[in-house]
From Swiss-Prot:
CDD domains in UniProt: LbH_SAT
Keyword terms of this UniProt record: Acyltransferase, Amino-acid biosynthesis, Cytoplasm, Nucleus, Transferase
Subcellular location(s) per record: Cytoplasm; Nucleus
InterPro entries: Hexapep, LbH_SAT, Ser_AcTrfase_N, Ser_AcTrfase_N_sf, Serine_acetyltransferase, Trimer_LpxA-like_sf
Record's protein name: Putative serine acetyltransferase
Keyword tRNA-binding in annotation: no
Domain of life per record: Eukaryota
Gene Ontology MF terms in the entry: serine O-acetyltransferase activity
EC number: 2.3.1.30
GO cellular component: cytosol; nucleus
Catalytic activity: L-serine + acetyl-CoA = O-acetyl-L-serine + CoA
GO terms classed as biological process: cysteine biosynthetic process from serine
Pathway annotation from the record: Amino-acid biosynthesis; L-cysteine biosynthesis; L-cysteine from L-serine: step 1/2
């Protein structure tokens, strides 16, 4: 991470918490029925870390049986590596809000979008895995799969600013690498071919897009800004800035301009 990128990230994290609180206060005025829920998740919290811990723990109550203990546990994990997970989460949140036309405001992205929640639970599991607590990491992986239908192995390497749209039926294998700014739709699989050991899952480069039902198998590379079309089966590399279509997938030309709002990190729908 460059110094400029680090500074932008710090500015982003500092700006999001007061904005979330302001939007929560406004929503309490618009709909007083939500005041208790918004107080529980945001307005009663002193920090973004406290709030995110609560938001992630509460939907798991039916799985774990104790959202309060999960909230405290998640709070401790979110503090690992100088709150690196928090920084990644806020980059994810900003990407979701700024590029998704279906997301009306920042508080909706934070409270209601399952892709954001599932991704942060992966980040918690990955933090545990990296600390050597693999059993706990796999438990969080399982809870996430049960609650959200998203199964990301905690050893997978995932960058910042991901956009998981709908977040149903997503599977990402143990040795997969997903770089910054990637967009993934529902029912996408990053799997192995069962013929390899070691690094056996795909590498998805920056700002690539994997559309609904795409399957990418083996240690193949989807290049930067490339798009894998809906239902495509990829078993060979996809070059940067190219569109792969079909089963088996084939290169059908450059990525059309209308994909730019999601493949170009500088584009926005807001």
């Amino acid at each position: 991470m460059t110094v400029q990128t680090a500074e932008r990230t710090i500015t982003l994290v500092q700006a999001i918490w007061p904005k979330l609180r302001k939007e929560a206060e406004k929503q309490c005025e618009v709909n007083p029925w939500l005041a208790k829920d918004l107080a529980r998740k945001i307005l009663s919290k002193k920090t973004l870390r406290e709030s995110l811990s609560c938001v992630l723990a509460l939907p798991l109550d039916h799985v774990t049986g104790s959202s309060e203990s999960m909230e405290n546990w998640f709070y401790s994990i979110l503090g690992l590596n100088d709150e690196k997970i928090i920084r990644s989460a806020m980059i994810d949140l900003d990407r979701l809000y700024t590029t998704n036309p279906a997301c009306p405001d920042l508080i909706s992205a934070f409270l209601s979008f399952r892709g954001f929640h599932a991704l942060q639970l992966y980040r918690i599991a990955h933090g545990l895995w990296s600390e050597g607590d693999k059993t706990s990491a796999v438990l969080v992986q399982n809870w996430t799969a049960v609650a959200y239908g998203v199964d990301i192995h905690p050893a997978a390497s995932i960058g910042d600013g991901l956009f998981l749209d709908h977040a149903l039926g997503i599977v990402i294998g143990e040795t997969a690498i997903v770089e910054d700014g990637v967009s993934i739709w529902h029912n996408v699989t990053l799997g192995s071919t069962f013929k390899d050991s070691g690094a056996r899952h795909p590498v998805i480069r920056k700002n690539a897009m994997l559309c609904t039902g795409a399957t990418v198998l083996g240690r193949v590379e989807v290049g930067e800004n490339a798009v894998v079309a809906a239902g495509a089966l990829v078993t060979k590399d996809v070059a940067p800035n190219r569109l792969a279509l079909g089963s088996p997938a084939r290169d059908v030309g450059p990525v059309p301009q209308y994909f730019g709002a999601l493949t170009n990190p500088n584009c926005t729908n807001k």
